[in-house]
Design a protein with these regions (language model features):
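Short, solvent-exposed coil/turn segments at beta-strand boundaries
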Residues: 36, 82-86, 110-116
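Short beta-strand segments enriched in hydrophobic/aromatic residues
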Residues: 33-34, 93-95, 121-124
Length: 141
């Protein structure tokens, strides 16, 4: 997905994050996320849920191991703000037709190996119904 005015390296990195994560490819995800990565979810009730990298990976592992279908790869880069070795990307993201769209904020950090996700924030898409950003599980873990 090419977005005018965005560093092609960041655009390519975001595409990898979406496609590798959507496939529950934990080995691939290991290379894309910093060791101290955090995940914040703003609920439709205004509460913030903070998850560690390990908690997010555990959820994706459980979904993969239970045979859940891959997540949808629907996304659109809305804006990227780059400041030296840091960048913030705002994305429209929809994980499944069974889950509402969300606004994704990716906090990126550039290191010797290139870009990595240092944090993510997920908020309800304006005007969308609240709910989990992941689709409901169809299989037990």
């Amino acid at each position: 997905m090419s977005t005018p005015g965005i560093d092609p390296a960041i655009a390519d990195f975001i595409a990898k994050v979406v496609h590798i994560g959507s496939a529950y490819d934990l080995d691939g995800m290991e290379r894309l996320y910093t060791a101290d990565q955090t995940f914040l979810i703003l609920t439709s009730e205004g509460e913030v849920i903070r998850l560690t990298r390990a908690q997010v990976f555990d959820e994706f592992r459980a979904r993969r191991d239970a045979g859940e279908p891959p997540l949808a790869t629907e996304y659109r880069v809305l804006h990227v703000e780059e400041q030296g070795q840091d960048a913030v990307a705002l994305l429209y993201r929809r994980m499944s037709p069974a889950a509402p769209p969300v606004l994704y904020e990716l906090r990126l950090r550039k290191g010797p190996g290139g870009w990595a996700v240092a944090g993510e924030t997920v908020t309800p898409w304006p005007g969308a119904e609240g709910g989990s950003f992941l689709p409901p599980r169809t299989r037990a873990a």
